[in-house]
A protein has these predicted regions:
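Outer-membrane beta-barrel biogenesis signature
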Residues: 1-7
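Outer-membrane beta-barrel porins/channels
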Residues: 8, 16-20, 24-167
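A short mixed-secondary-structure module that forms the rim of ligand-binding clefts
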Residues: 12
């Protein structure tokens, strides 16, 4: 756990790409011992897909295809994590993390959310036992949608076409 960092200050950075570079994952963290029994950490995570083609305006009102009307957007999740761990005695350590989450789907929608994790570790001789609770509150998100009338009309047309196809 966090109480076992072996230096007074630790910094971690990571970048990974998935699906031939389409999706990108970035992570950064800084951890610091507060005293001999406790430590704190601040972390940042971003997972996103950039340059997604927005084809909602590809076809104009007369049914003409115009590729110049394609725009691009990003869909990404970002999380800020604040963690704290404390060694209660030589055998027992506990800790927790509070997460603030921001989600964005282009200019169409965004959300703010939060979540909590906790953990405890007990060591008995050479045996180690641990328990973890991830997303104990679930990860609560409040979404805001930013759709203009034209976008809503496109959405209804797409739903109607889908229903007609599977009648």
């Amino acid at each position: 756990g966090l109480t076992q960092i072996d230096q007074d200050l630790q910094i971690g950075l990571m970048h990974a790409e998935y699906f031939a570079g389409i999706a990108k994952y970035d992570y950064g963290s800084i951890s610091k011992n507060i005293d001999k029994n406790s430590a704190a950490s601040f972390s940042f995570i971003r997972f996103g897909v950039d340059n997604i083609p927005n084809t909602t305006e590809l076809i104009d009102a007369q049914g003409n295809v115009n590729y110049d009307r394609i725009s691009y957007f990003t869909a990404a999740d970002m999380a800020f994590l604040m963690s704290y761990g404390r060694k209660l005695n030589e055998n027992l350590s506990v800790g927790g993390t509070a997460k603030i989450i921001n989600r964005k789907a282009g200019d169409f929608a965004n959300a703010w959310g939060f979540g909590f994790d906790f953990g405890a570790k007990y060591q008995l001789d050479s045996w180690k036992f641990a328990i973890m609770g991830k997303d104990i509150t679930s990860t609560f998100n409040v979404w805001n949608y930013h759709l203009d009338d034209e976008m809503i009309n496109h959405l209804y047309q797409s739903i109607d076409l889908f229903i007609e196809q599977y009648k």
